[in-house]
Amino acid sequence: MAKIGITETVLRDAHQSLIATRMRTDEFEGILEKMDKIGYHSLECWGGATFDACLRFLDEDPWDRLRLIRKKCPNTKLQMLFRGQNMLGYRHYSDELVDYFVKKSIDNGIDILRIFDALNDVRNLQTAINADKKYGGHVQAAISYTTGPVFDTEYYCHYAKELEDAGADSICIKDMAGLLTPYGTYDLVKALKETVNIPIQLHSHYTSGLASMVHLKGIEAGVDVIDTAMSPLAMGTSHPATESMVAALQGTPYDTGLDLKALSEVRDFFVPLREKYLADGLLNPKMLGVDANTLLYQVPGGMLSNLLGQLKQAGKEDKLEEVLAEVPRVRKDSGYPPLVTPTSQIVGTQSVFNVITGERYKMVTKEFKDMVAGKYGKTPCPIDPEFQKKIVGDEEIITCRPADLIHDKIDDFKADIAEYYEQEEDVLSYAQFGQVAVKFFQKRRDKKYGLDGKHDDMDNKIHAV
């Protein structure tokens, strides 16, 4: 039994889960120095969807955000979420780019990289793990937790051992869908503790209403660190409340040592932000409730709403139950991928197509075809060769590590954005987000030089002032 560490998620996963990652840097900048004095194990503040959201929606440079947080929080370890060979984008990238991104993340202030792969394919993590260790970061390798016939304790213990052998400094059980149950968590953590000799962290969303109980049983089984969120942006599709978990553990052998009065000051800062998000419609009250159907259908809450949205567009809302019944069949056909970005979208969309066309796999998305062909990596279970043939046709099945076939060069991307290039990190923004990054670079340049971008004549390089 030992003191439990707290990773605070309010600056990343909490608002990613509740308000689609729309919290601006200037909205939270004022509380950073107080948060630095709390004594968190770490502050999860970057990566995930924050990078995309900064460029696409907030007109912010994500690298500037990281540098500011580092400056204001010199005493707290900063943590990010990193999708291995996917980096923070939506496809696989070359080893050269992955290595460079990890280097620049650490150079700009990241201490801990939580690295995961949607298929739990350790090959997709190895380059990021190696780079993290090379540049002096802490490697937290994450297990994408899910349910299904193959996902038993033995499966997770085997994968955890693979991660430890690959170089992980700690392991995170990443329950992105809120599918863990309290006693199931206890058994899993006990087994993992007997399998690996590195710390274990627990990450569970409150979607199904079980996350606080999951944390408590995980702690009793030997978990070292838990993910929580300050109460104004906790619960619902977010995480257990930081203050509540700290209070629950006070005076026990697991006492976090954090001061509730100090946490209350942080809470008071975020309360008006929560009210603002509610008033603006950015925070839907439905996101704060419990969706027990998550446990019934075994799909993440976000995926459920996405499926409903697709059916509404097609005028087929009445087909939701059929689609939910189709999801596990599509998962089985495609090798039981865990349902997390991007595989949740791939499986979900294909399930919708199967139902609304009235014939399974009559229409197949490019992404589903690529996944079945092995372009995202090795699925947890082998895919039936006949099914692969049906979906992929004569296209070659990829059995090697997908990134072995990718040879993106940093210099090529740098040449593409020579006109806008201001910092080394711009190459990484562009490599992942293409024209989204270019539009941001244009706005940044216009603001810097007082230009009116609306009236630019790019063909003749004439800018209105």
At which residue positions do the language-model features occur?
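Non-catalytic positions within long, well-ordered alpha-helices that form the structural scaffold/packing
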Residues: D36, I106, E164-G167, I219
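C-terminal helical cap(s) of enzyme catalytic domains, especially alpha/beta-barrels
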Residues: A234-T256
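Hydrophobic faces of well-ordered beta-strands that scaffold small-molecule active sites
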Residues: I6-D13, H41-C45, T76-G84, L113-R114, ...
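Terminal or standalone catalytic/regulatory effector modules within metabolic enzymes
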Residues: D36-C54, N284-T294, Q298-V465
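N-terminal amphipathic alpha-helix/helix-capping segment at the start of soluble metabolic enzymes
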Residues: M1-I19, L66, K71
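Active-site beta->alpha loop and helix N-cap motifs at the rims of alpha/beta catalytic domains
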Residues: G47-E164, I171, A177, T181-P182
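Catalytic cores of alpha/beta
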Residues: F151-L163, S208-D224
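Glycine-rich phosphate-binding active-site loops on the catalytic face of alpha/beta enzymes
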Residues: I115, D175, A221-S238
